[in-house]
A protein has these predicted regions:
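Sec-dependent N-terminal signal peptides of Gram-positive bacterial secreted proteins and lipoproteins
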Residues: 1-18
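Structural recognition of the beta-strand scaffold that forms the well-ordered cores
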Residues: 93-104, 179-182, 204-209, 239, ...
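Active-site signature of cysteine proteases
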Residues: 191-193, 198-202, 208-292
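Solvent-exposed loop/turn segments at secondary-structure junctions
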Residues: 89-92, 100-101, 110, 150-159, ...
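Ser/Thr- (and often Asn-) enriched beta-sheet segments in non-cytosolic proteins
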Residues: 19, 61-65, 70, 177-179, ...
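Active-site-proximal structural scaffolding
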Residues: 3, 87, 92-95, 160, ...
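Flexible, surface-exposed loop/gating regions in the mature catalytic domains
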Residues: 135, 139-141, 145, 150-200, ...
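Active-site-adjacent structural segments surrounding the nucleophilic cysteine of cysteine proteases
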Residues: 20-160
């Protein structure tokens, strides 16, 4: 999905003998809307894109063959929550689900974020979040954010401003504050040093994409790596909790280097996986999210 580009227009308006030249002005750029749930596309209505969360996912898995590989960097949080929405009466829900993943993560330290809920437990000296089990407190949080973010009210899915407004209201009502900083770089890359600083500080991020990819798994064999991947043509939001860079070598030469964000899919099945950078995507924004 391409980012909409609207050009300014220089208009000449005539009223009989009166001639008025209008100043060059840019029409307001409509906000992208985010709503993919494993099926995604966008429709053009005139010149303005709208995202309705319906359509197709394209398989984009690939193989890499090499003499050897190195993990250049592997920066990630040990454990995070990953929820999905199983309620068919709330379609196009990736934004409220991403918001629920964020508040679910910080609920460990801010226990009123999800009322009557314990997000995880200490296991062998490490805190582990419980898997998604469609518990009522989580379902209630998704539904609350769905309403606060006005999902599907002003169009299919949720815009960035609706997401931020709804999440801020939810966090404030729970007695906490939300802040955020950008780690966006361009349409296919994020600022990895900024993300690394955030992850090392125990924070999570968020990516907002007009088109995206999701990697279900990276399987390494002897001299061979398989990447199980799909590309989606619709707006999508995912929580981010780290990144991994892999360099491949043949005959002593580094011929390919791939970087992946660790992400929560936001799909109904609540998978965790990756999003490949410098690949099929249109990253509109990337934010480090903090609740305190």
């Amino acid at each position: 999905i391409t980012v909409p580009v609207l050009c300014g227009v220089l208009a000449l308006i005539n009223f009989g003998s009166l001639s008025v030249t209008a100043a060059k002005a840019e029409a307001p750029v409509p906000e992208a809307r985010y709503c993919a749930e494993g099926e995604a596309r966008y429709l053009d209505e005139g010149d303005e894109p709208s995202y309705d969360g319906q359509g197709g996912i394209v398989g984009a898995s690939y193989d890499v063959y090499y003499d050897y590989k190195t993990i250049v960097e592997d920066v990630y949080l040990y454990s995070v929550p990953s929820f999905g929405n199983a309620n068919s009466s709330m379609p196009n829900s990736c934004a409220p689900v991403a918001g629920t993943n964020i508040v679910g993560y910080y609920d460990r330290w801010s226990p009123n974020l999800i009322p009557d809920y314990t997000p995880g437990a200490m296991v062998s000296g490490n805190y582990r979040y419980y898997p998604d089990m469609s518990r009522e407190p989580v379902k209630n949080t998704i539904a609350s954010l769905y309403n606060l973010m006005q999902t599907n009210v002003n169009g299919g899915g949720t815009s960035e401003s609706e997401f931020m407004s709804g999440l801020t209201t939810y966090v404030t009502n729970a007695g906490y504050s939300l802040s955020y900083t950008s780690f966006h770089q361009n349409a296919t890359m994020v600022d990895l040093p900024k993300l690394k600083t955030a992850i090392n500080a125990g924070k999570v991020g968020l990516v907002m994409c007009s088109k995206y990819n999701f990697v279900y798994g990276i399987m390494h064999y002897d001299g061979h790596t398989q990447v199980a991947k799909e590309n989606g043509d619709a707006g999508h939001m995912m929580m981010v909790y780290g990144y991994k860079t892999i360099a491949y070598y043949k005959d002593g030469v580094n011929f390919q280097t791939d970087t992946f964000l660790y992400t929560c899919s936001g799909y109904g099945a609540a998978e965790t996986g990756y999003m490949q950078l410098n690949d099929y995507s249109q990253i509109n924004n990337a934010l480090v999210m903090t609740i305190a």
